[in-house]
């Protein structure tokens, strides 16, 4: 009876671990922090888009061999993140949202650091989201989120008044991350 109890306990533990690892990377795990950041600046929520998620998964699968922080150059807005030894949905979105401190609304520019990932998260016209996560061959985790319509258009603010002020060239949009 002890052996059977041990087998059952191991199976339950394994099932919980599998469930919790998937639970940390579900569509809602990507949407919730995106929508929380958007809510803070008065922007409406995003919805999950399976077409974007499939696009993201296809591209993430291409990065398994190298975990390269290289944009897909597709038709969507895109944020990338990679980390070792662990990275989940909430962690990736937190990295992007933490760039908020570098975004200066008055000048519509990044001051003291990169903020283009943050501005894409809160871009008012981006209303559909799809993300994917893979573990690369070197053990790093790679996450990509795609946004439709894309954001980060020069001369436009991510949120707020539709009356735009001139673009400040200090806005550093990511080219390789």
Swiss-Prot record:
GO terms of biological process kind: defense response; sexual reproduction
Keywords, alphabetical: Disulfide bond, Pathogenesis-related protein, Plant defense, Pyrrolidone carboxylic acid, Signal
Superkingdom per UniProt: Eukaryota
InterPro entries given in the database record: Allrgn_V5/Tpx1_CS (IPR018244), CAP_dom (IPR014044), CAP_sf (IPR035940), CRISP-related (IPR001283), V5_allergen-like (IPR002413)
Segment forming the signal sequence: 1-23
Coiled coil location: none
Residue numbers bearing the Pyrrolidone carboxylic acid modification: 24
Limits of the SCP domain: 31-147
One Pfam family linked to the record: CAP
Annotated function: Probably involved in the defense reaction of plants against pathogens.
Protein name: Basic form of pathogenesis-related protein 1
Organism of provenance: Nicotiana tabacum (Common tobacco)
